[in-house]
């Protein structure tokens, strides 16, 4: 199992579903995904630190432009870092996501 798969499993299907998570990206040392429904955060990045804790970074997409180049659609995005939190234990993931996004992660 990869680190990204482990993080996704720790978050759980319900959490990812409630966040409207999509475009999950395996970063080798972590997981990055987009969410829907939050006015403060659009992207969450969770990286495994060598201390066996996580570094969570929350991003807001400020600008998104799409254009066709040689009939291929390209998207350009400008991201703004909202918050970075170090030394996060796996059992704090839900609480911190709820705090930063304003969205529920559990029923």
Where are the predicted features?
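Negatively charged, low-complexity tracts enriched in Asp/Glu with abundant Ser/Thr
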Residues: 1-38
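Ser/Thr- (and often Asn-) enriched beta-sheet segments in non-cytosolic proteins
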Residues: 32, 55-57, 78, 84
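Mixed-charge, Lys/Arg-enriched low-complexity segments
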Residues: 62-107
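Short, surface-exposed beta-strand/strand-loop-strand elements in extracellular ectodomains
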Residues: 52-65
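Short beta-strand micro-motifs enriched in acidic
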Residues: 47-51
């Amino acid at each position: 199992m990869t680190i990204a798969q482990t993080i996704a499993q720790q978050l759980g299907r319900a959490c990812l579903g409630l966040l409207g998570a999509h475009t999950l990206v395996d970063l080798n040392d972590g997981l990055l995904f987009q969410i829907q429904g939050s006015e403060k955060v659009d992207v969450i990045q969770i990286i495994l630190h060598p201390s066996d804790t996580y570094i969570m970074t929350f991003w807001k997409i400020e600008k998104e432009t799409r254009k066709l180049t040689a009939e291929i659609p390209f998207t350009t995005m400008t991201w703004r870092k909202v918050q970075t939190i170090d030394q996060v234990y796996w059992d704090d993931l839900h609480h911190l996501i709820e705090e930063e996004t304003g969205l529920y992660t559990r029923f």
